[in-house]
């Protein structure tokens, strides 16, 4: 019956909190007419069936579960913002990520930086998020950011936050100053997830934000229309970044927190596994597997992703996304991809000496531009980022095109 099916989200919640209880699973299987044995299966069925509206008692029950874990969770769902009609995502698809609000995964706020020459804790193969804004060059090692997943900082005079979702493999650099707001947003980790993607929150309004899109989805700002500007950042090895930017600043290992910041320690098993830690519907994997890395660009209402492995045997790809011609320069070994606009008909090639070339012209690769050797022409950097394929293809609301050779 329709009324009984409204209880499905309640049983999905019970599957999580009872540890896949077989009696709850049997009830769910009967209601959904689908064999369900685990919370992962139940959650994925729920994601695929948005027509199921939860029973009126669902919200109170979910708040009880969350509140018993950490009463700070309740701040995100206060009336009237926690009502179904005020939220941009379904309450039943919001799940606990296993940590408390802003405690288990604390953000780094204006963290101490040191000179590259003094960063003796890093080894050449360590990956970093490299950032350059207005000549201010910084590196934030993934081995540290994996523990914190968020920094709030000012780079080149621009207030920014890097939100790193380890579960979906994406580190995205957002500008946090928004027109009409008195002060830049300061972000932290909520401890909640949506389809295996972190929900961050801003400390001022305590609205929940989609980490992948930079948009508020629950809370006072959900109807604001705010969408944070994305700045380019580059994943690369410390050796490559240091060679390209010897005067770079780098995040100090003295963060003020006690963590095991050793190379390759954080999330080692998850990064090596083909499986997801938390449930999310995964689409067709005939071309690319769920946890293969892609570099994605979204613009002009279109989205496109390039497998990072496509750069294993080539450095340069000329392509188009959303009607805009782009050139991508990558290195699969270090998960590095940079993208730049190019003019119509312009084709870039690798000169095998670290630069690019077009007909009769050489170009230097910088963090902000491609610059012609005579300094007369520039091609602007296009914001994009690396993530797992399952995440890129699941969070935009736009079906992504996938590059194939």
Can you say where each PLM-predicted feature lies in the sequence?
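Mid-to-C-terminal functional-domain signal that highlights helix-capping/loop sites
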Residues: 12-14, 23, 33, 37-405
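Alpha-helix capping and inter-helical loop/turn segments
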Residues: 2-7, 19, 30-38
């Amino acid at each position: 019956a329709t009324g009984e099916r409204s209880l499905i989200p309640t049983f999905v919640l019970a599957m999580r909190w009872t540890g896949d209880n077989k009696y709850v699973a049997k009830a769910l299987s009967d209601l959904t007419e689908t064999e369900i044995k685990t919370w992962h299966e139940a959650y994925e069925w729920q994601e695929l069936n948005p027509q199921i509206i939860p029973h009126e008692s669902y919200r109170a029950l979910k708040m009880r579960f969350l509140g018993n874990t950490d009463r700070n969770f309740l701040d995100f769902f206060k009336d009237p913002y926690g009502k179904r009609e005020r939220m941009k995502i379904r309450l039943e698809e919001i799940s606990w990520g296993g940590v408390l609000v802003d405690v288990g995964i604390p953000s780094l706020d204006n963290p101490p930086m040191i000179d590259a020459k003094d960063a003796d804790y890093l080894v050449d193969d360590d990956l970093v998020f490299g950032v350059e804004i207005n000549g201010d060059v910084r590196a934030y090692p993934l081995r540290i950011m994996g523990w914190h997943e968020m920094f709030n900082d000012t780079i080149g005079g621009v207030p920014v936050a890097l939100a790193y979702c380890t579960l979906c493999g994406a580190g995205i650099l957002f500008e946090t100053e928004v027109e009409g707001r008195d002060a830049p947003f300061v972000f932290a980790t909520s401890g909640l997830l949506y389809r295996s993607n972190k929900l961050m929150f801003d400390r001022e309004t305590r609205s929940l934000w989609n980490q992948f899109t930079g948009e508020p989805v629950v809370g006072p700002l959900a109807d604001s229309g705010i969408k944070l500007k994305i700045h380019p950042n580059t994943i690369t090895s410390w050796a490559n970044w240091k060679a390209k930017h010897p005067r770079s600043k780098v995040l100090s290992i003295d963060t003020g927190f006690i963590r095991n910041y050793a190379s390759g320690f954080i999330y080692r098993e998850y990064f090596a596994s083909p499986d997801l830690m938390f449930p999310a519907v995964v689409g067709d994997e005939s071309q690319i597997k769920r946890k293969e890395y892609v570099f994605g660009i979204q613009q002009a209402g279109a989205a496109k992703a390039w497998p990072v492995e496509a750069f294993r045997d080539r450095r340069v790809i000329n392509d188009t996304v959303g009607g805009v011609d782009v050139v991508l320069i990558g290195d699969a070994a270090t998960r590095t991809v940079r993208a730049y606009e190019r003019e119509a008909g312009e084709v870039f090639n690798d000169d095998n000496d670290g630069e690019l070339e077009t007909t009769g012209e050489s170009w230097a690769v910088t963090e902000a531009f491609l610059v012609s050797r005579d300094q007369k022409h520039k091609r602007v950097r296009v914001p994009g980022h690396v993530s797992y394929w399952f995440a890129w293809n699941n969070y935009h609301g736009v079906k992504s095109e996938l590059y194939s050779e």
